[in-house]
Design a protein with these regions (language model features):
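N-terminal helical cap/lid subdomain that shapes the substrate entry/recognition surface
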Residues: 2-94, 101-102, 113-115
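Substrate-recognition "cap/lid" segment bordering the active-site pocket of phosphatases
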Residues: 84-87, 113-149
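Generic hydrophobic alpha-helical segments
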Residues: 92-96, 148-149
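Short active-site oxyanion
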Residues: 103-107
Length: 149
């Protein structure tokens, strides 16, 4: 019998692409870089925040000082706006409810910085109690590395 299921967050339980794109574009624009269409971000996501920003910056990411500025501006914007357009995918709340009814524990492991994970889950799934939910922490490598598990 399955005792626990651990889900990814972005692109699995929730569609967060628009908020990610808007926040990265905010950082790009503030630093004189070209904003990218939201659609492009489908190819930028995966492997965590730093890779997301590097991919959006293109070759400009090699300027360490500029990269750190874009990242800081992104972080500041995303902290306020991470739930503006983000929503759970259809059927996820019901799936989580069915798992809970069967006694299956649920968890979330995300490459998103840890400080955003709980906030987003509480808005999207206010009636579900996750056994464990965590995001990227400095002491662990990002997924697909299994370190955080």
């Amino acid at each position: 019998m399955v005792k626990m299921v651990v889900f990814d967050l972005d692109g699995t339980l929730m569609n967060s692409l628009t908020d990610l794109a808007i926040s990265v574009n905010y950082g790009l624009k503030l630093n004189g870089l070209e904003e990218k269409p939201v659609e492009n971000y489908k190819t930028y996501v995966g492997n965590g925040r730093e890779m997301l920003i590097r991919r959006a910056m293109g070759d400009a990411w090699t300027d360490h000082e500029l990269f750190e500025k874009v990242k800081a501006d992104y972080d500041r914007h995303y902290a306020v706006h991470c739930n503006d357009h983000t929503a759970a995918y259809d059927g996820c709340a019901e799936m989580l409810e069915k798992l809970a009814e069967k006694g299956v524990k649920t968890g979330v492991l995300s490459n998103k910085p840890d400080e955003f994970v709980d906030k987003m889950l509480k808005k999207a799934f206010p009636n579900h109690k996750f056994t464990q939910a965590w995001g990227q922490k400095p002491q662990y490598k990002t997924k697909p590395e299994p370190d955080a598990l």
